[in-house]
Design a protein with these regions (language model features):
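Electron-transfer interface patches adjacent to heme c in soluble/periplasmic c-type cytochromes
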Residues: 77-94, 109-118
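Boundary of Sec targeting at the N-terminus
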Residues: 14-19
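C-terminal capping alpha-helices of c-type cytochrome domains
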Residues: 97-104, 110-131
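Conserved beta-strand positions that form and line the central face of beta-propeller blades
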Residues: 38-39, 64, 81, 105-108
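Sequence/structural segment immediately N-terminal to covalent heme-attachment motifs in c-type
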Residues: 43-66, 72, 95-101
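Electrostatic cytochrome c docking/interface patches
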Residues: 21-52
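Bacterial N-terminal signal peptides
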Residues: 2-11
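Short, non-ligating residues that shape and space the ligands of small metal-coordination modules
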Residues: 66-67, 115
Length: 131
């Protein structure tokens, strides 16, 4: 049973950073949390962020960020609901760090997206919460 737990444990971690039945949070380092988004919110930033989101994130997080994408059911956990205010309490720096480093089953995007692309995605995510 111990080996099975070790093998399956990482798969039980939710995208929001909590483990089922745990109070452990996925927390960005303080220095990362203080980072400011250098990309101003604009039509072009939102459009770029939406395009990336629809290509890279929608399969799990869903079109409106509700965690109901077509691949969500196959993950074994429920993807974070990005539209329900989960991100409202997090700084842009925290979100940037989480997108950059990832946490299974969410991949890291350190080499998949440029820093500007990651900031554009954050601007787009913020627009989902405002809807």
């Amino acid at each position: 049973m111990g080996i099975l737990t070790l093998l399956l444990g990482p798969a039980l971690i939710t995208v929001s950073g909590e483990q089922p039945g745990s109070t452990e949070k996925w927390t960005a380092p303080a220095a990362e949390a203080r980072k400011k988004n250098p990309v101003a919110v604009s039509e072009s930033s939102l459009a770029a962020g939406q395009k990336i989101y629809m290509k890279r994130c929608v399969a799990c997080h869903g079109k409106t960020g509700n965690g109901d994408g077509p691949d969500a059911a196959d993950l074994g956990i429920h993807p974070a609901k990005l539209s329900d205010g989960l991100i409202r309490g997090q700084t842009d720096g925290e979100l940037f760090w989480k997108i950059t480093v990832g946490k299974k089953p969410m991949p890291n995007y350190v080499s998949r997206l440029s820093p500007t692309d990651r900031w554009n995605v954050i601007n787009y995510l913020r627009s989902l919460v405002r809807r």
